[in-house]
Amino acid sequence: MGYRKLGRTSDQRKAMLRDLATSLIVSERIETTEARAKEVRSVVEKLITLGKKGDLASRRNAAKTLRNVEILNEDDSTQTALQKLFGEIAERYSERQGGYTRILKVGPRRGDGAESVIIELV
């Protein structure tokens, strides 16, 4: 299966996709370019599938990709992006077989005219 190079070396591309995937798990909605959104969609779909499995091996595989970001909840407790993935998000999509993300076109970006989109969890 092919992939987009996104004008970066493989290390830079991997780091960017990790950052975007973590941001999408934490915020559940991000704005980025269309090419980046299509690439990060693949990463996030696989992460959510791992979250639904819920076993130790899946947790370790997801931890390889997600950044160790702390999230402050409404009740002043904190959780990591990994905990949110395996708790809240895995529960929400337990009955859904794929298709966890949605891409909405926003229009061209002001600075360079790149096609902007919003990618969000369904």
From Swiss-Prot:
Please provide the record's keywords in A-Z order: Ribonucleoprotein, Ribosomal protein
The molecular function terms in GO held by this entry are:
structural constituent of ribosome
Q: Tell me if NAD is a UniProt keyword of this record.
A: no
- Per the record, GO CC terms? cytosolic large ribosomal subunit
Domain of life, per UniProt, equals: Bacteria
Ribonucleoprotein is among the record's keywords: yes
What InterPro entries does the record tag this protein with? Ribosomal_bL17, Ribosomal_bL17_CS, Ribosomal_bL17_sf
Q: Which GO terms describe its biological process?
A: translation
Relate the assembly described in the record. Part of the 50S ribosomal subunit. Contacts protein L32.
Extract the PANTHER family matched here.
Answer: LARGE RIBOSOMAL SUBUNIT PROTEIN BL17M, RIBOSOMAL PROTEIN L17
Describe the family membership recorded for this protein in Swiss-Prot or TrEMBL.
Answer: Belongs to the bacterial ribosomal protein bL17 family.
**Cited NCBIfam families:** L17
Q: What is the protein name stated in its UniProt record? A: Large ribosomal subunit protein bL17
Its source organism is Staphylococcus epidermidis (strain ATCC 35984 / DSM 28319 / BCRC 17069 / CCUG 31568 / BM 3577 / RP62A)
